[in-house]
UniProtKB/Swiss-Prot annotation:
<keyword id="KW-0406">Ion transport</keyword>
<keyword id="KW-1003">Cell membrane</keyword>
<keyword id="KW-0813">Transport</keyword>
<comment type="similarity">
    <text>Belongs to the ligand-gated ion channel (TC 1.A.9) family. Acetylcholine receptor (TC 1.A.9.1) subfamily. Gamma/CHRNG sub-subfamily.</text>
</comment>
<keyword id="KW-0770">Synapse</keyword>
<keyword id="KW-0472">Membrane</keyword>
<keyword id="KW-0628">Postsynaptic cell membrane</keyword>
<keyword id="KW-0812">Transmembrane</keyword>
<comment type="function">
    <text>After binding acetylcholine, the AChR responds by an extensive change in conformation that affects all subunits and leads to opening of an ion-conducting channel across the plasma membrane.</text>
</comment>
<dbReference type="GO" id="GO:1904315">
    <property type="term" value="F:transmitter-gated monoatomic ion channel activity involved in regulation of postsynaptic membrane potential"/>
</dbReference>
<comment type="subunit">
    <text>Pentamer of two alpha chains, and one each of the beta, delta, and gamma chains.</text>
</comment>
<keyword id="KW-0675">Receptor</keyword>
<keyword id="KW-0407">Ion channel</keyword>
<protein>
    <recommendedName>
        <fullName>Acetylcholine receptor subunit gamma</fullName>
    </recommendedName>
</protein>
<dbReference type="GO" id="GO:0045211">
    <property type="term" value="C:postsynaptic membrane"/>
</dbReference>
<keyword id="KW-1071">Ligand-gated ion channel</keyword>
Amino acid sequence: NEESDLIADKFTNYNKLIRPAKH
């Protein structure tokens, strides 16, 4: 649903912020 999709998007952005060099 929309809510879990929004959470997943924020979580993805969070992972990008904490591990930018890993990707």
